[in-house]
Swiss-Prot record:
Its main location: secreted. SUPFAM superfamilies: C-type lectin-like. Residues 1-24 form the signal peptide. InterPro entries: C-type_lectin-like (IPR001304), C-type_lectin-like/link_sf (IPR016186), CTDL_fold (IPR016187), DC-SIGN_domain-containing (IPR051004). This is C-type lectin mosGCTL-7. Carbohydrate-binding protein. Keywords: Disulfide bond, Glycoprotein, Host-virus interaction, Lectin, Secreted, Signal. Disruption phenotype: (Microbial infection) RNAi-mediated knockdown results in reduced Japanese encephalitis virus infection levels. Glycans are attached at residues 119, 144. Disulfide bonds join 59-166, 139-158.
Length: 173
């Protein structure tokens, strides 16, 4: 009986220590969560990386869509939003464009409209049907580096994980 109680005491002590350690490691940015859930915030950058599909799903969960970029002015607004986050140093963010329905025919997922205005990087070539190494590169990423001269668009594998930008939209609930 004594062994049982001392073993239980030891286990409870370790559980208490583990709880304190985990509590110290896991910090919650309450301000970011508030912004993310605030229906009046026009754009949010969730606090985790995801593949393009999961990012789309999460934005819908927030009654938003992956951001669409329809002009240089809109891209500048997005850039300013990103500069105001702690994610800016990551340099790459999912937006709502892809050519998943037809190779080379890019559309905005949330509206179904063809991408007219664009800001493709000249440094990263577009994938082609005859390049088997890039067959999964179908989703648009807003990527920033000095060689590209600021945020430019590139097409990458939709299953790669990046931060992403959600926005309130006409088609969001």
């Amino acid at each position: 009986m004594v062994v049982g109680w001392s073993l239980l005491g030891w286990a409870l002590s370790w559980l208490a220590v583990a709880t304190v350690v985990v509590s110290a490691i896991v910090t919650v940015d309450k301000e970011a969560l508030t912004r993310e859930c605030d229906p009046d915030t026009p754009m949010v950058v969730p606090n985790f990386k995801a593949n393009w599909f999961k990012a789309t799903e999460y934005c819908h969960y927030l009654d938003r869509n992956l951001v669409i970029v329809t002009s240089a002015e809109k891209q500048e607004v997005i850039t300013k939003v990103l500069e105001g986050t702690d994610k800016f140093g990551d340099n790459s963010f999912w937006v709502g464009g892809s050519d998943l329905a037809e190779l080379g025919n890019f559309h905005w997922h949330s509206t179904g409209t063809r991408i007219v205005w664009h800001n493709w990087s000249e440094l990263v070539p577009m994938p082609t049907a005859d390049d088997p190494t890039r067959k999964d590169d179908r989703c648009v990423l807003l990527s920033n580096n000095t060689e590209m001269g600021g945020f430019k668009w590139i097409v990458v594998n939709c299953w790669d994980e990046y931060y992403f930008v959600c926005e309130k939209g006409v088609f969001a609930k």
